[in-house]
A protein has these predicted regions:
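Active-site neighborhood of phospho(di)ester-bond hydrolases with catalytic His/Asp-centered motifs
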Residues: 53-57, 74-82, 105-106, 172-177, ...
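Short beta->alpha connector loops
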Residues: 57-60, 155-159, 177-180, 231-233
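Active-site-proximal beta-strand elements of phosphoester/diester hydrolases
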Residues: 7-13, 53-55, 149-155, 170-176
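Active-site beta-strand termini and strand-to-loop segments that position acidic
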Residues: 45-48, 145, 165-169
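Pre-active-site segment of Zn-dependent metallo-hydrolases
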Residues: 19-77, 81, 87-95, 180-187
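Short, small-residue-biased leader/transition segments that mark boundaries at the very start
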Residues: 1-6
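Metallo-beta-lactamase
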Residues: 106-161
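Cap/insert and terminal regions of metallo-dependent hydrolase folds
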Residues: 179-259
Length: 259
């Protein structure tokens, strides 16, 4: 039988700079509410038979120490090659004690990772190097991690095509999207949970604003939607959360979602 997601943890809910932003004294960056502290965007999913990491940014080490999770990671789904989504891959080293870890990405991202981390992909690796290998995937072509079905689909990060992922029947994860082609919307029917990016109030050339994310959420119509990849320009979590419709939420670091 196919496996499905039953639990997910938001490891990081922030944009590329994180929140607080270094040197900023705005009310969000100086807020005492822990929900206003945002590490770079990443999530950890538990399905019936797999543990799956989505993106592995520069805060990955700190995120895993916070959740105190040390177990086999069955696969890492990479959305795109920007540093805030792949900068922590070297920190997978302790998790390689459980065995080699497959890294799933499109070919463009895989090419960048080979260039950026060549030492990980040599035939004769130096001891202590992460035991990871690349698996290239394409939008619309499903694959499995153990018995958990994954469907990659294309979203547009400004002009850069990147990947979103539907994991099992119930959950989909999208980050860094500005727009999405029609065929991707067709892959996203009947979702229990949608995780999607909402950067800030004002429009941005490569990321959805909060109002654009609300339109996307409405169109997809998941039972619950969680926004991620926020900057300090979204305002205080407590204030911004009150303005959202029912069943739409701002995620925060450490948030657990049971399905």
């Amino acid at each position: 039988a196919a496996s499905d997601v039953y639990k997910r943890q938001i490891l990081g809910s922030g944009t590329s700079t994180g929140v607080p932003e270094i040197g900023c004294k705005c009310e969000v960056c100086t807020s005492a509410d822990p929900r206003d502290n945002r590490l770079r965007a990443s999530s950890l999913l538990h399905t019936d038979d797999a543990v799956i990491l989505i993106d592995c940014g520069p805060d990955f080490r700190e995120q895993m120490l916070r959740v105190a999770s040390f177990e086999k990671i069955d696969g890492v789904l990479i959305t795109h090659e920007h540093y805030d989504h792949v900068g922590g891959l070297d920190d997978l080293r302790p998790f390689c004690r459980f065995g080699e870890i497959p890294i799933y990405s499109d070919d463009y991202t895989a090419t960048h990772l080979r260039a950026r981390m060549p030492y990980c992909f040599l035939e004769h690796k130096y001891p202590g190097v992460p035991q990871i290998f690349l698996q290239e995937v394409e939008p619309g072509k499903n694959f499995f991690i153990n018995h958990t079905e994954i469907i990659p689909f294309q979203v547009m990060h400004g002009r850069l095509p990147i990947l979103g992922y539907r994991i099992g029947k119930r959950l989909a994860y999208i980050t860094d999207m500005l727009t999405m082609p029609e065929e991707s919307y067709e892959q996203l029917q009947d979702l229990d949970v949608l995780v999607v990016n909402a950067l800030r109030v004002k429009p941005h050339p490569t990321h959805q604003s909060i109002s654009e994310a609300l339109e996307t959420a409405k169109r997809i119509g998941a039972r619950e939607t969680y926004f991620i990849h926020m900057s300090h320009h979204m305002g205080l979590h407590a204030d911004a959360e009150r303005l959202l419709p029912p069943h739409v939420h701002f995620a925060y670091d450490g948030m657990r979602i049971s399905l």
